[in-house]
Amino acid sequence: MKRIFNIVLIFAVAAMTLASCDSNNRNQDYMQPKLAMQPDGIVRLSKIKVNPEYLDEYMKFAAEVGTVSLQTEPGVLTMYAVADKDDPCSITILETYADQEAYRRHIASEHFQKYKQGTIHMVDSLVLDDVTPLNPKNKIVNFIESE
């Protein structure tokens, strides 16, 4: 149980922080100004099953790609990853992209390709579920805190 807690804690601290903040905080020096969600925007739950022997290594890759994506890509609006409390190898990532083009730029980016190529052998399964927000007016403000 302590190992699970430590993994979740390390990942949460290293990867990203979901927080409410005013619009001024979204445009800090360490973050690109974010684009607005467009009608063709994407809200996705990525469900990943990681091979247990690679979990620690996978977490490092995931933390890096999440951080770099939020810091450098205006169209990446949210990258919030969580691990199942009872099965830390089951990872779910809430991803939001301003539009289809932002998603295409993201998956073509150097940091995403590094993550994808570096973790492909670590992932047992991947399900990408595009979802529809129940209340489109409810916005998530996701940012990386400066160190």
Question: Which functions belong to the PLM regions below?
Answer:
Residues N25-N27, V68-T78, T96-T132:
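An amphipathic, aromatic/His-enriched active-site/gating alpha helix that lines ligand/cofactor pockets
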Residues G41-K49, T78-I107:
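Short, well-ordered beta-strand segments in beta-rich or mixed alpha/beta enzyme
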Residues T17, D22-V43, Y80-D87, K116-E147:
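Glycine-rich beta-strand-turn "strand-cap" elements at beta-sheet edges
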Residues M1-V8:
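Bacterial N-terminal signal peptides that target proteins for export
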Residues V8-T17:
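Bacterial N-terminal signal peptides
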Residues K49-Y58:
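Short, surface-exposed ligand-recognition loops at beta-strand->loop->(often short) alpha-helix junctions
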Residues V43, A63-S69:
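General detector of folded, globular domains
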